[in-house]
Amino acid sequence: MLVSQSANHSINSLSRFGMSSHLNGIGNIVPMVVEQSGMGERAFDIYSRLLRERIIFLGTPIDDAVANTIVAQLLFLDAEDSEKDIQLYINSPGGSVYAGMAIYDTIQQIRPDVVTICFGLAASMGAFLLTAGTKGKRMSLPDSRIMIHQPLGGAQGQAIDIEIQAREILYIKAQLNQLLANHTGQPLERIEADTDRDFFMSAEEAKNYGLIDQVISRQNLPTAGENVTIVK
């Protein structure tokens, strides 16, 4: 799902299903990891500990705050070591087009290869970021679902404001379709037809489509901190 909101307008591409993001209560409890060293004990939240292994999790709808966090982590890992792979795990129904494009452009600009791994669901902008990983290093667990579609839009206000938003959503639709065609190798005409409505795929179907390069299991799961061999 892609969502972009201004004061009076929104461009949506979020998956319209029974999914929720728990921001309060037990759903937001972050486990802590305690490490022993010569200096004593040191506690990390689990995501910071995984970041040390060059693993980033995108497990929520995508908004500006999420994008800022993901981009900051990508830039940090790029500065730390430009030759080691970064692993980006994705379980997301999508979200803001503009926030998602901030993550996308960062993935394309940083020096390390970005290994993208779908677990659960990669829908809309989540699927777009999945296929934006380094060619040959885009993966999915076998029972994951991947969905692509066109952005959804709504506008209110004066006629000229609605016209401006209509032009913007058509521009975004064309841009995303062209980038999907570039990353998947599919003809633009097929991308346009398939994204006209929600288009769901299994992991194997996404591989055949060109969204990912391999379906992984325990035997070939990427190892933290190690570079992944490109699948051709």
UniProtKB/Swiss-Prot annotation:
GO molecular function: ATP-dependent peptidase activity; ATPase binding; serine-type endopeptidase activity
Catalytic activity: Hydrolysis of proteins to small peptides in the presence of ATP and magnesium. alpha-casein is the usual test substrate. In the absence of ATP, only oligopeptides shorter than five residues are hydrolyzed (such as succinyl-Leu-Tyr-|-NHMec, and Leu-Tyr-Leu-|-Tyr-Trp, in which cleavage of the -Tyr-|-Leu- and -Tyr-|-Trp bonds also occurs)
InterPro entries reported in the protein's UniProt record: ClpP, ClpP/crotonase-like_dom_sf, ClpP/TepA, ClpP_His_AS, ClpP_Ser_AS
Keywords for the protein's UniProt record, in alphabetical order: Cytoplasm, Hydrolase, Protease, Serine protease
Any one cellular-component term (Gene Ontology): cytoplasm
EC number annotated for this UniProt entry: 3.4.21.92
PROSITE patterns per UniProt: CLP_PROTEASE_HIS, CLP_PROTEASE_SER
Pfam families registered for this protein in UniProt: CLP_protease
Compartment(s): Cytoplasm
Task performed by this protein: Cleaves peptides in various proteins in a process that requires ATP hydrolysis. Has a chymotrypsin-like activity. Plays a major role in the degradation of misfolded proteins.
Subunit and interaction comment: Fourteen ClpP subunits assemble into 2 heptameric rings which stack back to back to give a disk-like structure with a central cavity, resembling the structure of eukaryotic proteasomes.
Stated name of the protein: ATP-dependent Clp protease proteolytic subunit 2
